[in-house]
């Protein structure tokens, strides 16, 4: 696509509902350590947390941001569930969290620390966007769903898959207050790593683009 000089391609050329990147969701072996890297090396700040203290005993997530760039770093608290005998802790895992825990361990085994979800911010009807994506070949991963946080409104999201193990969540925050936690189930963080007071600020504006790597000779098939 050729864009004339000084012409803004957003949002009209990519669809009226598309706003930009909402966040990049990583699966990592050590979320706290990964968050520390982005905070101390790239000027990110911690903005939200999910873990045992917030009602997520099996998974931990740290959310870090630098201006318009937001990363979610998620990792397991315990080993993978299995078909054999399990201790009492693993036997208590609800089916949904069991599936997510197994997925994260498998992703880490195959890829190491890496991106799982490139999430897009959507304005408007997510149901229509999701249906259009699926009708044009996207895999239906999670149908549109609405989550609420008392006092902060609601957030609508859905997820599709394109190729490989990476997925794309569609997120509508139009009725979700700006001072709300990152997502339902998360807790706001406003503390800073003391080392950042000794480091120069790094000003990142936003995520410009993400590249989906393909195996040798695999690009043509994906494009088709």
Where are these regions (language model features)?
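A structural feature that tracks compact, well-ordered secondary-structure segments
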Residues: 37, 63, 74-76, 119-121, ...
């Amino acid at each position: 696509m050729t864009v004339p000089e000084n012409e803004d391609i957003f949002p009209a050329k990519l669809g009226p509902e598309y706003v930009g990147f909402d966040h990049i969701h990583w699966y990592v072996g050590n979320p706290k350590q990964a968050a520390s890297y982005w905070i101390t090396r790239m000027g990110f700040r911690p903005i939200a947390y999910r873990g045992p203290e917030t009602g997520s005993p099996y998974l931990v997530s740290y959310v870090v941001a630098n201006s318009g760039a937001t990363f979610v770093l998620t990792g397991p608290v315990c080993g993978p569930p299995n078909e054999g005998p399990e201790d009492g802790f693993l036997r208590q895992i609800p089916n949904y969290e069991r599936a997510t825990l197994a997925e994260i361990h498998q992703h880490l085994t195959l890829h190491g620390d890496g991106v799982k979800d490139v999430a897009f911010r959507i304005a408007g009807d997510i149901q229509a966007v999701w249906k259009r994506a699926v009708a044009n070949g996207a895999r239906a991963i999670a149908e549109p769903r609405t989550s609420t946080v008392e006092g902060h409104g609601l957030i609508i999201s859905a997820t599709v898959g394109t190729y490989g193990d990476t997925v794309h969540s569609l997120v509508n925050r139009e009725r979700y207050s700006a001072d709300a936690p990152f997502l339902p189930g998360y807790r706001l963080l406003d503390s800073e790593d003391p080392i950042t007071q000794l480091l120069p600020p790094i000003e990142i504006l936003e995520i410009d683009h993400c590249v989906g790597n393909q195996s040798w000779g695999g690009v043509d098939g994906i494009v088709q």
